[in-house]
Structure formats: C-alpha cells, structure tokens
Amino acid sequence: THPEEFALPTLKVEATLRDYQETGVKWMSMLHRYGFGGILADDMGLGKTLQTIAFLSSQLKKETNVLILAPSSLIYNWLDEFAKFAPEMDVAVIYGLKPVRDNLIAEGHQVMITSYASFRQDVEEYSQLNFDYLFLDEAQVMKNAQTKIAHHLRNFEVKNTFALSGTPIENNLGELWSIFQIVLPGLLPSKKNFLKLPAETVARFIKPFVMRRKKEDVL
C-alpha cells in the first residue's frame, strides 16, 4: 500500500496540515498498522514535530505511553509544540537534577520528553515503564553504533520506534545502519555486508521505511 492511499486517521490537533504533512501522518500510521517503525527525514522546517504530534493525537488512548528523546536544546521546543497543537495531551519534560527527574518519571505522564544525556542516566527508571512509542529526534545522534546511548536504545523494549532526522541520512550508510538497528532491528544485513551493497539495493531495502521530502519539492 502507498501512504497516499492509506486513510488519514482522525487527528486531534489544533492545526491545518499541508498535503505533504498529511502524507507523512498517513505513512506513520501505515507503518504502525503493520508493526513497523520508520525514519521521517524531511528537510528542516517542514514540520516533522507537527507530523509526529498529529500522528500521536490519532493513536493515543488513556493507557498509551510515549517517550521522546531529543538533544537538550530541543526538548522545550517539543513541549511548546505540544502546548500549541495538542494542549489536551498530558506532556512533561523530564529534565533537571536526578531527584527532580526521578519524581517526574514517577508521576507517569502520558508523553515524556527528555534529552539523550538524561535518558542515558535514567535508563533503568525508563526500562521499568511500558512505552508504546519511542521517538528519536535528530536521530543522527546515534550515528556511531558503539555509543552508550545506541547500546541502551537497542536493548530498550518498546512497541514502536520512529526516528526523525533533518539531514539526508542516505548519504552515510554507517549512520543509516546504526539508526535502523534501533528503529527496525533485524531488517538490514550485518554492517559489514550492508556497507558493501550497491546503492540501488540499499535504496530498495530502506525505501518503505524512510520518508524524505525536500523543501523545494513541497513548498
């Protein structure tokens, strides 16, 4: 099925989505329906955050839990966007000193937003919770499969993972492979074999799971 043909779910956001953003939400919904994650790699400025919030607004039930990881410079931006587009959602930024973060985690908010650095320190606490969705903003942070954060995320149990990246990840196969190990473990061959594949084979492997639009194509 092509995302364009997939029905747009009922969105509960205070925003009018552009056509390409609706396609992004359909694509996420389609992957989710079939039990897959994916990488939303639109150019910066095309509203990856809004598309994510719109998708979540269509999926959230009372018992659904979401974890969003982002660089610390972006976590409050996420909070602002939720307040603007989906003020009904129970959202909290998990940030500050360790006791403060522990208390916030224990409060059990439906959507938790934290930095990669804080997550690394709090991974034990998060592992005790059941998350339905994990979103990795600026996912190229995991470009090195050897980093501690990548290791923690590969072992982190969650039903559905999406990565967001504003850089053309297909330009760096090693980076792409590392992100796929977290988003869709087992889909790609070993790193050694993957790096030897011709470009068209790589494109065929990843095409259904990567959505990338350029500014000049959609604006």
Language-model segment annotations:
Residues 1-219:
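ASCE P-loop NTPase motor core, strongest for the SF2 helicase catalytic module
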